[in-house]
Amino acid sequence: MADKLTPSDVKGLFEKLSNWGRWGKEDQRGALNFITNEKRVAAARLVQAGESVSMALPLATIPAPDNPNPVTHLMVQAGGDAHEQALPYSGDYFAIAPHGMANTHIDALCHVFWQNKMYNGFDASEVGSHGAKKCAIDVTRAGIVSRGVLLDIPRLKKIEWMEPGQKILPEDLDAACLPWLHERRIAVLGCDAVSDVVPSGYDGIMLPIHVGTLVAMGIHLIDNADLDAVSSTSVKLGRNEFLFSMAPLILERGTASPVNPLAIF
């Protein structure tokens, strides 16, 4: 595939790679349907060392340029109030806006739209002021357990980090692009940023990876994963594959959930 596609090429890919109707016209799970019971059993057999690694960032409570909606953490009851209670306890309250570039989260298939449609052709109007009636994040209520593979592009290129705006091409993954993901039946894609280059470089297409995965193929996205520890563990053990396990919160009608993805080697 050429390095630079035209906007028309990208729009054509959305149609060519579409999974709409693949699992029925009412399907809301998308590529999660690729994860069968047999695949979960096979993934469990990947555990050899028993080492479990988190791929989540701490919830960001401090305002920053990349965190305009910080997590609110308030104490409902604290230790200093214990003497006033028949049963002393501590408790807290959290308010989270999961989307953005600060917190590790999984996008629901209703998160973005293309030509006023979400995955499987459901209309954007299915998401209203009370949340999403279709393709909400609670379709993941049984958890996501499968084989995980780390694609460590900086290590492949023998560099410390990727430069801002630097693209990852298919040859980087075979020695990310939409056809590569489609051919391999990827169920979930995660990244230490937001998977898309910003700006995209394609007129009229703001987030082509988001549109191609969430809308066209029904692939859920994990944004802002912390991959440093899993990368170092991968190097130490000489393995890039592991048992992947994640249980998003059951947020009915939600467009996302904060998550703590685990890699178990």
Where are these regions (language model features)?
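Active-/binding-site microenvironments in catalytic and ligand-binding cores
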Residues: 1-265
